Amino acid sequence: MLHLFQSFIGTGDQFLIGRFALLIIALCVIIATCLCLFKKSRWKLHQIYFIAVFSMGLVFMCTLPPLSAPDEILHFTGAYALSNQMMGQPVRDEDGHVRIRQEDEYLVNWPGDNDPCKATVLGQALDRSVYEAMHEKGLFHATETGTSITLQQPVKTTPCAYLLPALGITLARLLKLSAVGLVLLGRFMNLLLFATLGAMTVRRTPIGKELFFAISLFPMTLELAGSYSYDSYIIALSFYLIAVILDLALAKPCAGITRKNVIELSALALLLSPCKMIYATLFLLCLLIPVQKWGARPWPKWILSVLLIGALIVGSILLVNFREVIRYVNASGVTQAPEFTSSGDVNTVKLHDLAELIHDRTLVFRIIRNTLQILGGQFLGTTVGMWLGAFDRGLATPMPMLVLFWAGTLLLAIIGRREEPALSIPHRVWMFFVFLLLGFILMVSMLLAYTPADTFYILGVQGRYFLPFLPVLLLAFRAPQLHRLRAIDRVGIGFDALLLGVMMLMDALVLLGCFLTVVQRA
């Protein structure tokens, strides 16, 4: 490492030495500050959460280059299209391409690939030249005027998922920031939303506060939080939904369900369900709430609430994702592939379909079994962040750290607090069932939408898809009886604070490793 940075002295890459030193200082300050806050009892956990997750996410956001996260370019395009609408400008050209500033064409048609005929996305391939390009471009001054287009097409989803990033892009355009400044400001707004909703989750949930904190410190979660990915929005909203339901279910019997609670759940249904349909399954957790909490004559009120929330879920999904619904229930199982054959014909791929699954009722279970046998270890690794970027094997979290992340998270999930409400056996069974059902729906949806009929395991499933409902499974094993283990105290820091501090330290080591990997790639 020392030899590498010595080679930068006196060259155009000398700025990387300062960046690396600044990165180390920032990480040390963040970790030291959070450990000090843990020792001060007057600081609430949700306040420490916001500071820790926002600051760590900010460092991840600035270190991992723009548009390097999984599918980030598609979500950036969606946010840019919404920004066009906010500014009252044409969203697309006559050919259906999203309009962007000429300045921002640099991001989607990066000249650093030295191929004028190839539209390479900045951050698609990570090497030293990406940092050099960002340094040369700067943050604050756009150098080009006029408009251009991007060939990238946005993801079809609710505009709510891109509202904050689009606000960041709009502000950057009004301030005439450079392309790099624009893309970072949009990322910043998405991170701000994630940290805010996460802090609200930790404050609201009656159990598992440290668990939500720990999952938010996974390298994968921090990378997504500081990117344009709508997974950041989904994870944050899912966490808050789980916290709201647990609060309503486990609060004291005298705390009934009010109109405000129903409105809150209805708003969450509108915000979350159309973004990624499968996560609407989380609303089944509402059945944890005792019917008696609806007050006198509860059943009519309960039924009305269920019908209202259910109608909002179904209606919002059909309004936003009608074509996707048809795609998942596709009877023919034939889809157009994006490439052409050598003869110029459009290639078609036969996918698994519902008729096939209905005819052979054990097929889906055999395929899921094969998938878990082949990719189960990868799911566990990529949930934490085994590979960052676009599954870049060089931007990796080492195996010992993956084990420690999982071990720390499991301990924080299982070891409860004496004063917190306990989950009953029916509660635990239902939470376990909802987790299995959501996992099953996830697998089946990817089987029907992406998996060729001649493939015996499911394609397209990634570990990050499990993050929004991972707390449901882990909280089902909560054991307040083990609260004595929290009495373990090291250097004046509590058990949970010690584990969270270790996770932050591992995040720092992972990020430093990623930076060194990228700068070594000439």
Where are these predicted regions, by residue range?
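Transmembrane-helix motifs of polytopic, lipid-linked glycan transferases
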Residues: 32-36, 181-208
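Transmembrane-helix signature of polytopic, membrane-embedded enzymes
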Residues: 43-47, 177-180, 199-219
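Short acidic/glycine- and proline-prone juxtamembrane loop motifs at membrane-interface regions
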Residues: 227-234
